[in-house]
Design a protein with these regions (language model features):
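TOPRIM metal-binding catalytic domain and adjacent DNA-binding surface shared by DnaG-type primases
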Residues: 1-22, 27, 31-34, 42-130, ...
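Phosphate-handling DNA/RNA-contact segment within nucleic-acid enzymes
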Residues: 112-206, 221
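Acidic beta-strand-to-loop metal/phosphate-binding motif
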Residues: 165, 205-226, 246
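Short phosphate-binding/catalytic loops that engage adenosine nucleotides
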Residues: 180, 240, 244
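Short, acidic/turn-prone active-site loops that include or flank metal/cofactor-
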Residues: 186-192, 212-214, 249
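Short, aromatic/basic amphipathic alpha-helical patches
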Residues: 219-240
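Acidic carboxylate-rich catalytic motifs and surrounding loops in phosphoryl-/glycosyl-chemistry enzymes
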Residues: 245-252
């Protein structure tokens, strides 16, 4: 499996030269550029580019037991944080986010005193913890080192004929506040494999992808693209279910909820979207 790292200002995308959205393989052999097209579309959005003069992929792979032990440690770490969790923290966080307290609790958040941030577990399609997303009071987001991507959802959810897919834990809490069966991806281009597994396990027949209302980004040729919608389309194309894409009138679902959106408002907007297979 190829290991990817995000581009930065110090190490921008080698294709479009931008400091965000794109990724480069750890061995320097490949680049997924979200702006410059190639003949190979990436399943998570963007296009795959083979970099010139790149070194061959390494043959060595770490022992698989190491990964399993690490995930077990993350699950134990989250469980230990949950033992200290108190309804006062929950009430304050729910109030600051503008979501329902019970809906937020279904995601099993915790407070991490070492990082001075709230901790949201990321799970695979079977419910096991695969990583921990951190969010401080200023809204800054990062993850506990050593974990991987996963989904934000209620581990008690056993079945759902229709699933709403959001971006991030707070939008997922907003969807749960509206009374939806929901799961959140870490970003608009990740969590695909876990979501496929979750959809199969829950018996989902339909999936509504709720895309962030992002501003337009520019490709090198000057054409515009919208990360949230592009990521939603890429996801819809690989789920193998009836899907539709909904874009809230505010920057994301939680912002729309804060502005007073109701379940009826959501259903009216969703009804205007077209169901498609793939």
């Amino acid at each position: 499996m190829i290991e990817w790292k995000r581009v930065t200002r110090q190490e921008p995308c080698p294709v479009c030269k931008k400091p965000d959205w794109c990724g480069v393989s750890a061995d320097g052999a490949w680049c997924v550029c979200m702006r410059a097209e190639s003949g190979h579309a990436s399943k998570n959005g963007g296009w795959l580019h083979r970099l010139k003069d790149a070194p061959p992929p390494p043959k060595f792979r770490p022992p698989p037991t190491r990964r399993r032990n690490l995930l077990a440690s993350l699950a134990s770490y989250h469980a230990a944080l949950r033992l200290r969790w108190d309804w006062i923290w929950l009430d304050g966080l729910a109030l600051s986010l503008g979501v329902d307290m019970d809906a937020l609790e279904r995601l099993q958040p915790a407070y991490d005193p070492a990082n001075k941030a709230f901790a949201f577990p990321m799970r695979d399609g079977g419910g096991a913890v695969t990583g921990i997303r951190l969010r401080d009071c200023g809204g800054h987001k990062w993850a506990v080192r050593g974990g991987g991507d996963g989904l934000f959802y209620d581990p008690a959810m056993a079945a759902a004929g229709e699933l709403a897919v959001c971006e991030g834990p707070t939008d997922t809490a907003a969807a749960l506040t509206l009374g939806l069966h929901a799961a959140g991806r870490p970003s608009c281009s990740s969590g695909v494999d876990a979501l496929r597994a979750l959809v199969r396990r829950l018996g989902c027949r339909k999936v509504t992808v709720i895309a962030d209302h992002d501003g337009a980004k520019r490709r090198p040729d000057g054409s515009a693209w919208f990360p949230g919608v592009q990521g939603a389309r890429s996801l819809a194309s690989v789920l193998g279910r009836m899907t539709r894409i909904v874009v809230p009138p505010e920057k994301d679902l939680r912002a729309w909820l804060i502005e007073g959106a109701t379940r009826q408002d959501y259903e009216a907007l969703a009804a205007s979207a077209t169901w498609r297979l793939g």
